[in-house]
């Protein structure tokens, strides 16, 4: 068996596993669309604008699919309900990026992917968690993931709340630029013209079907692997 074939088979099994993990997270969080896949698409668009290296973009897409594995592993009912969290619940929830990092390691994700999962709730002003990183201490990919995750969360419906319009979601992101989000990443997000179209990107697919496509013509696996 050739090295190339073994590598291709390994990649295929990895992407199937990662997509299944993403589907499990989406089901647990009860998003109307496959949320993690949509985050990956938005994050990749932003990363492309920053001329991020192909391998770094691949790691970012993988981390986007795995970012909330910690919430799934914790299995807390408060994650799925409307309303504010108690102080105890919020402290508990803030453990999920570290648990997600551990779950990503168990899934044999690369170390850079594990760290992006760990840092996807770090804030530009240093008030995020778990490590209170600030500004450029946070890797660019993690800053991109923070914005993409937030935008997708605002514009994806859940059983206890409707989705925001694109206009309202953008306004919410702008309001938090320089606080939660890197202003440079927000600027790129606002420059993207096809964010609404990416809703059609987030549709259920069979992870074993390498020919599966989405409405805008992207191939799910070519996006994941390139």
Describe each PLM feature range:
Residues 2-226:
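Histidine- and acidic-residue-rich, metal-dependent catalytic cores
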């Amino acid at each position: 068996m050739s090295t190339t074939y073994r590598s291709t088979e390994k990649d295929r099994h990895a992407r199937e596993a990662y997509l299944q993990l993403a589907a499990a997270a989406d089901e647990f969080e009860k998003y109307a669309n496959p949320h993690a896949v949509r985050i990956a698409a938005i994050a990749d668009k932003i990363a492309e604008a920053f001329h991020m290296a192909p391998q770094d973009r691949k790691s970012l897409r993988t981390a986007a699919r795995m970012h909330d594995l910690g919430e799934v592993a914790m299995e807390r009912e408060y994650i799925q309900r409307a309303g504010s969290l108690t102080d105890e619940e919020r402290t508990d929830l803030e453990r999920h990026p570290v648990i997600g990092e551990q779950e990503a390691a168990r899934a044999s994700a690369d170390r850079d992917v594990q760290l992006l999962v760990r840092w996807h709730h770090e804030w530009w002003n240093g008030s995020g968690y778990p490590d209170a990183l600030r500004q450029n201490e946070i890797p660019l990919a993690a800053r991109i993931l923070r914005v993409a995750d937030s935008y997708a969360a605002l514009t994806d419906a859940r059983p206890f709340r409707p989705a925001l319009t694109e206009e309202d979601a953008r306004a919410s992101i702008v309001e938090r630029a320089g606080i939660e989000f890197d202003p440079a990443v927000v600027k790129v997000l606002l420059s993207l013209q096809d964010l609404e179209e990416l809703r059609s990107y987030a549709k259920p697919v069979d992870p074993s079907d390498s020919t599966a496509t989405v409405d805008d013509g992207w191939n799910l696996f070519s996006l994941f692997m390139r």
